Amino acid sequence: MTDLALKYGLSFADLYDRDGLVRLDRAFVAHLAEGDAALHERLMTARRDPDGLGHAGESDLLVDLAPHVEDFLGHLFGIAVEVRALQARHHELAPLYSVKRLFVQRRAVKGVKEADAAALDGPGLARELDRLIGASPGERMPEWERRYAEHVARWLDDETANAAVLDLSQRYAAWATLSPDGREKHRRGVLFKVPQRLDPHHLVPVETIEREGVTMLRLPEDEWRHREGFALTDHGADLIGALDQANYCIWCHNQGKDSCSKGLKEKDGAFKRSVFGVTLAGCPLEEKISEMNLVKARGYSLGALAIVAVDNPICAATGHRICNDCMKACIYQRQEPVDIPQIETRTLKDVLGLPWGFEIYSLLTRWNPLDLRRPLPRPQTGKKVLVVGLGPAGFTLAHHLINDGHFVAAIDGLKIEPLPAEISGVAVDGSRQPFQPIRDVARLVDGLDDRVMAGFGGVAEYGITVRWDKNFLKIVRLLLERRGQFAMYGGVRFGGTITIDGAFALGFDHVALCAGAGRPTVIPIANNLAPGVRQASDFLMALQLTGAAK
């Protein structure tokens, strides 16, 4: 394994030590001053009075800083070449999204009826285009669409000289976007998909079938995702899909309209409600979503992750398949919303996929120059907090308490399996020892059908099916377990093994109850508690805790 050789005279241990992080922050500030003196002065002014910026000023500053954070991290970890290669992949895909918006949506399909599009000779047009763009027979759709977009972008530079090929391209785009055969051919692509209007009462596409005299609704068969065993069934969007969504976003923080983050408001300031009565409050963390989308669309994945980590440092436990309050409050209320969770998760995965990617993400949860209010962990306070429950609430609270300088002991009723001491820094007996940097995140990944139930994560461990990659729980666990101010104990029941009086007798200054709601959401339908009828939460808990999943 290649050893980690950090720049600026820092060691790996410095990244987990407050004094080392202070030196790191000074190195970044000097790096910024050398590269952009005016931006450096803006950062220093903002750190002195972060609330004086206002929302718009803070957004502009973070977006401007993000590329510099990315360059600094690439140099710090010695992966500048890999970071530039990741940026290049983003830039190579850029024509897809500009051509989709400016040519396909605004020209090719405008005013064209579906019947007229279906009458076009799509296969014949495709053969002509294959010759013009140099596509080979059987070429994969993402690559074909990229070739098409690159050529159309070049042809648009001189529309007069390229009128004939642009007309051909426009007719093909209309066929591919509007006709049933075209939509089927490009079902796995992004270029010829336009946002659809939303019918809130028919959000899931279904078809009507009749079987044995009974009329029923079902998902169209070509949308079925077959599950065999307990392997991961949803790997999420790839880079093409995530950037498609990031470019679909109109980056409305520029107008102060980023309702995905701040919620949709009525004129009186109250939050709007959906047709189902759901409050459209946006992201509970007020994550800077629009800013993330803009920076990601510009090709800066590390910079985008740094923006996410300001408000949502434990983003490994959010995103795709976990939460969608942001989507519900998206400014697009009458058409498909931006798939924000996909963008967030893809951004994290792109960083984790770099050499030392886990260490970069981990570092941003402790030191984040874009966090104007707490760029560094605060000095130790000597205060001790007992966190009851290691589900999403417990582990997120524990993280923030540690960064505020407190000591945290966390307990959970589930048995928590130990991790190897060389990656966790904790031996089986609970003693601390040095741990190794992780170069390749694959070292932390297990197949979900082979994965041992680790016990960490609460409801995220036992209540979520294999549509979500539970390897993220190991990543979250390591963010905490490697911290010297944190200890956790499984198989401890609050109120039994330890009581509130016992906790204070042990010297804890505060007890935080993060044990969950305790009761399931009961669906209000007749006979819902009849024998043989199980609530989803009850079924999943029994499935996971009895080992039936294995």
Say what each PLM segment does.
Residues Q380-A409:
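N-terminal Rossmann-like FAD-binding beta1-loop-alpha1 element of flavoenzymes
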